[in-house]
């Protein structure tokens, strides 16, 4: 727990007085958040499914109205870049680009897997070992997930990638470390993984309100996206699903 808290303090040192609008549409959850100096001032979330196209503009307006009502000037827009839902990522990035361009503010990209790790790291109600590794998992299709493995400094030990799960997955990390698995992809991994060093953290989804530390750090470093040419981090090519024939297969 000591190392985990020190890492959180390290992030807090990077906080600025910037007012940032955060957008996440990487999974079936649609969310926005307005923050200043790391404090959440306004947030909107919907967990009902793929309603991003219908809801996102309204969520953004609520946050911008809050900023205007409190005489705050937006300094940047942050958006989750993926991996995740192809359609969701496109919707979120398109809205973020348009807003950043219209308001003439920088655009910040946040890796969705790192966003999920940040959520777990900052949840001090979790009693995790000091040497724990973090393995976020986003459901892809069948037994495939988007995943990576990170240490306490958010350094990727397994680079973000699509992974087809089997009983040997993550073996090199589980051999000598406790590994915390979380995200909607972990639900299909838990029945397969029987390793005693595996811990499963429930109910972890990417949320705009968890982007604060990562977005603030990027803002303080001047790490901004090219509004015109930035694209989502899909990690794999889109594969359209063939409609099932009503006559079956032969």
Report each predicted region and the residues it spans.
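Polybasic, lysine-rich low-complexity intrinsically disordered segments
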Residues: 4-6, 10
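Surface "functional belts" at beta-alpha junctions
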Residues: 12-16, 39, 51, 106-206, ...
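N-terminal beta-alpha supersecondary unit
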Residues: 13-81
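Conserved hydrophobic/aromatic positions in well-ordered beta-strands
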Residues: 33, 146-150, 233
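Phosphate-handling active-site elements
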Residues: 65-74, 100-110, 125-129
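DPxDG-like acidic metal-binding loop motif
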Residues: 78-112
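Acyltransferase
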Residues: 201-250
């Amino acid at each position: 727990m000591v190392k985990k808290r020190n890492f959180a303090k390290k992030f807090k040192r990077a906080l600025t007085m910037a007012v940032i609008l955060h957008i996440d549409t990487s999974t079936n959850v649609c969310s926005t958040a307005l923050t200043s100096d790391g404090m959440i001032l306004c947030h909107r979330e919907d967990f009902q499914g793929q309603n991003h196209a219908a809801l996102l503009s309204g969520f953004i307006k609520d946050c911008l109205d809050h900023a205007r009502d409190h005489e705050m000037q937006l300094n940047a827009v942050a958006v989750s870049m993926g991996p995740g839902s192809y359609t969701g990522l496109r919707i979120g990035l398109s809205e973020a680009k348009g807003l950043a361009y219209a308001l003439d503010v920088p655009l910040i990209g946040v890796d969705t897997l790192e966003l999920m790790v940040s959520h777990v790291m900052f949840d001090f109600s979790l009693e995790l070992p000091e040497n724990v590794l973090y393995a976020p998992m986003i459901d892809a299709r069948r037994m495939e997930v988007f995943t990576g493995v990170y240490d306490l400094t958010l350094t990727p030990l397994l680079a973000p990638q699509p992974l087809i799960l089997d009983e040997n997955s993550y073996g090199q990390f589980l051999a000598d470390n406790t590994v915390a698995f979380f995200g909607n992809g972990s639900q299909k991994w838990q029945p397969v993984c029987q390793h005693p060093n595996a811990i499963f953290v429930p109910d972890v989804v990417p949320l705009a309100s968890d982007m604060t530390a990562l977005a603030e750090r990027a803002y303080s470093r001047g790490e901004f996206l090219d509004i015109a040419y930035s694209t989502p981090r899909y990690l794999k090519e889109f594969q359209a699903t063939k409609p099932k024939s009503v006559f079956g297969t032969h």
